[in-house]
Amino acid sequence: MKTKSIFSFLLFFLITLSCKNSDNVLDNNEKDYPCNLNMENYDYSFGVQYDNSQLYLTPGTQSDLNDEYFEEIVIIIGTLPNTIPGILTVCDWFNHNFTFENAGGNMIGQKSVNELYESKTFYGCHSAALIISSILREFGFPTVMIETASVEWAYDYFDGVTQSFGGHVMTEVYVLEKWILLDNNGTFVEDYDCMNPFISTIDNQGLFTYAKGKDIWDYGVRDPSDTHNMMINFSDNVGCFDDKFNSVNYEWDN
């Protein structure tokens, strides 16, 4: 359990995370924060068609794993049952066969899944989620990558407390006729609401989803500045989402 916790910390991107220890992200909301968005028709699905899961068996450009590489993986781990333990088999294989290289967030959006597979290297949660979701898709699990920002970070960044960035990238997986949330370290939420952008974490650091797609190129992230701009936009409008914060309290399993 200790190893899994450390690994999860390593995947919390980008450079450093400046945050306060708070049991409730709303503790920061003692003043009025801005909202400059039209919330009347705000789309929390981010264009994902959840009622048509088969669409997410088709990879994006970045996540199109070579058949040869997938065949190598099948030789090692075999075929997988359409179950959560089957999904976790891929996470376990990834965690034991890829090496983490700390690039300080500079590799976000830079490599395709094939380039990452060839080097057996990942640079943080963006590349980890890309590898895992791409492989799961080849095994027949529809997958969607989600990009999130720390709610605590959004307040701190707006207040000028930090200039660094804090968030996380994970995967939504369709299995047994429902969408679950999968972290890169193999922990997961089975009772998951894919239309709620707020995500409660094990350590009470709430996350807020701001982008989704088949891979990060699919939702427009080609370099670190794309992620930074999306996060800054969330921070600049954090007051729009007060009613969503702490709206769910997930139980994480492994």
At which residue positions do the language-model features occur?
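Bacterial Sec-dependent N-terminal signal peptides
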Residues: 17-35
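Secondary-structure boundary elements
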Residues: 35-123
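Sec-dependent N-terminal signal peptides
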Residues: 6-14
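Positively charged n-region of N-terminal signal peptides that target proteins for export
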Residues: 1-5
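Short N-terminal edge-element motif at the start of the domain
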Residues: 100-103, 108-122, 126-147, 151-152
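Hydrophobic/aromatic-rich core segments of domains that either
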Residues: 130-214
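Alpha-helical and coiled-coil interaction segments, frequently adjacent to or embedded
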Residues: 192-194, 199-254
